[in-house]
From Swiss-Prot:
Pfam families listed in its UniProt record: TPP_enzyme_C (PF02775), TPP_enzyme_M_2 (PF16582), TPP_enzyme_N (PF02776)
Family designation: Belongs to the TPP enzyme family. MenD subfamily.
Chain's gene name: menD
Gene3D superfamilies: 3.40.50.970, TPP-binding domain
The name this protein goes by in its record: 2-succinyl-5-enolpyruvyl-6-hydroxy-3-cyclohexene-1-carboxylate synthase
GO BP terms in the entry: menaquinone biosynthetic process
Length: 556
């Protein structure tokens, strides 16, 4: 019997089972122990293959693919720390709902805890972060093929959101020619090989029912809070709120068009907070709010009813409101809860939102990151999408910009880390094939510099704007100790990214005013492939501009 041949047949069943659950994209890192999985994936024509030498970046590439495709994405890595490098992407997927299937090759049990090379304790290593965990045995013909395929089906069929960790031990030899070993074992599955359905099918029914008293609450004074949702849902939410006559507080990831722009500015005004206190019901559609003032208001508001609608399970409400947690997609919830045409009840808030927007526009002439955030709408590619990094840049765009309704916006706002942002943006672009504008800070770019390699395969124009304010300037907005702030919080690196772009063969520009930025972007959207545009800005201007606008709007 050929061990290497049966390893591959075992892996082929696993990979074929994944295709029955909508897996098209598969991300593969180099490794020897993962050879059976890699070769099985390479031979399966149902897959679109993606490769990367860095497992941490590979995990985030898969995360971006899952975000834009809205399909489960598989990842193959070898044993040891290669597996551990998937942890950040898995954590993010668990918090934002993307389905990642991690196939981690492993040493067989007899090589664990005995000093064998590249052998760590992988079963259960991700603790509670995966939605499902499967620790497979070593491949054996004594285990029926139908057990293997039904084990995969059970886990994926029950997967509502988040990751699945499938640990796959393989014994050596891993290489060799294929022979007839395991053919009869595979044939136990009969016509399954010719079908496109799972071996084990199960229905996943998790959505909440229609709220029978909605007809009553829709006649009251309400507020709509829009968190993370799809572009199509964002447009529908904006129309729904307008019909109800309820003010809409739209997050940067809501894709609602933010009809009341600059919410994170005007929520610092006492008049707005007083008017919102008259609301009898707050309906929050989507989680993961960004703005600090939005979160502060959300934490202190006390309506008669607080409803939170999201298709992810769990509370998702750090303020622990008394109310209803409704498990549903936003689109389905809107279908079940139609709006009734009513006159707007809030009069102060629209005025404040308009004044806040005018204040932001009036401050947009100097060349800086706050001004870039306010102007961002004019730089979006037609029929494209926006990927927003974390830390200061996402807060500036959330507070100062007004994005088009229904324009796709992506970000990693689950755990809100600065790791893997370039890789995630690359995955979003690959899955959608749209022109993509991605914006990250300089520390985020340094953290994920390896992933510039992934941008070389962009299928449509991709522009990565690196806002270089020389460090983590978000900490200048926090009460960090003055004497220790620069060394221990801001950590300026005094770098530019020209050589990084050259190393990976990417086009590079470093504009120093708005006309030169306009010119660089116009050229980037006309050429195929990726372009890095570095904006070297004054270190403190972005944070100071935001603080000045907050103070100005609070006095209106």
């Amino acid at each position: 019997m050929s061990v290497s041949a049966f390893n591959r047949r075992w892996a082929a069943v696993i990979l074929e089972a994944l295709t029955r659950h909508g897996v098209q994209h598969i991300c593969i890192a180099p490794g020897s122990r993962s050879t059976p999985l890699t070769l099985a994936a390479a031979e399966n024509r149902a897959f679109i293959h993606h490769t990367h030498f860095d497992e941490r970046g590979l995990g985030h590439l898969a995360l971006g693919l899952a975000k834009a495709s809205r399909q489960p994405v598989a990842v193959i890595v070898t044993s040891g720390t290669a597996t551990a490098n998937l942890y950040p992407a898995l954590i993010e997927a668990g918090l934002t709902g993307e389905k990642l299937i991690l196939l981690t090759a492993d040493r067989p049990p007899e090589l664990i805890d005995c000093g064998a090379n590249q052998a760590i304790r992988q079963p259960g290593m991700f603790a509670s972060h995966p939605a499902q965990t499967i620790s497979l045995p070593r491949p054996s013909q004594d285990i029926p093929a139908r057990w293997l395929v039904s084990t995969i089906d059970q886990a994926l069929g029950a997967l509502h959101a988040g990751g699945v960790h499938i640990n796959c031990p393989f014994a050596e030899p891993l290489y060799g020619d294929m022979d007839e070993t395991g053919v009869e074992w595979q044939q136990q599955l009969g016509n399954w090989w010719q079908s496109d359905k799972p071996w084990l099918r199960q229905a996943l029914q998790l959505e909440s029912e229609k709220q029978r008293d909605w007809f009553f609450w829709r006649q009251k004074r309400g507020v709509v809070v829009a968190g993370r949702m799809s572009a199509a849902e964002g447009k529908k939410v904006a129309e729904w709120a307008q019909t109800l006559g309820w003010p809409l507080i739209g997050d940067v990831l809501s894709q609602t068009g933010q009809p009341l722009p600059c919410a994170d500015l005007w929520l610092g005004n006492g008049k707005a907070v007083s008017e919102l206190a008259q609301a009898q019901i707050v309906v929050q559609l989507g989680s993961s709010l960004t703005g600090k003032r939005v979160l502060q208001w959300q934490a202190t508001c006390e309506p008669d009813e607080y409803w939170l609608v999201d298709n992810l399970p769990g509370r998702l409400d750090p303020a622990q409101h008394c109310g209803r947690r409704l498990l549903s997609s936003v689109e389905r919830w809107l279908e079940l809860h139609p709006a009734e045409k009513r006159q707007p009840w809030a009069t102060v808030i629209p005025q404040l939102a308009g004044q806040a927007w005018q204040a932001a526009v009036a401050s947009n002439e100097p060349f800086g990151e706050a001004q870039l955030a306010q102007r961002i709408r004019r730089y979006l590619p037609e029929q494209g999408q926006l990927f927003v990094g974390n830390s200061l840049v996402v807060r500036l765009i959330d507070a100062l910009a007004q994005l088009p309704a229904g324009y796709p916006v992506y970000s990693n706002r689950g755990a809100s880390g600065i790791d893997g942002l370039i890789a995630t943006a690359a995955g979003v672009q690959r899955a959608s094939a749209r022109p993509t504008l991605a914006i990250v800070g300089d520390l985020s770019a340094l953290y994920d510099l390896n992933s510039l390699a992934l941008l070389r395969q962009a299928s449509a124009p991709l522009v990565l704007i690196v806002v270089n304010n020389n460090g983590g300037q978000i900490f200048s907005m926090l009460p960090t100790p003055q004497d220790e702030r620069r060394q221990f919080y801001l950590m300026p690196q005094d770098v530019d990214f020209s050589h990084a772009a050259v190393m990976f063969g990417l086009a590079y520009h470093r504009p120093d005013d708005w006309p030169s930025l306009d010119e660089a972007l116009a050229g980037a959207w006309r050429r195929a492939g990726a372009t890095v545009i570095e904006l070297a800005v004054n270190e403190t201007d972005g944070a100071q501009t935001l603080q000045q606008l907050l103070a100005q709007v609070s006095r209106l």
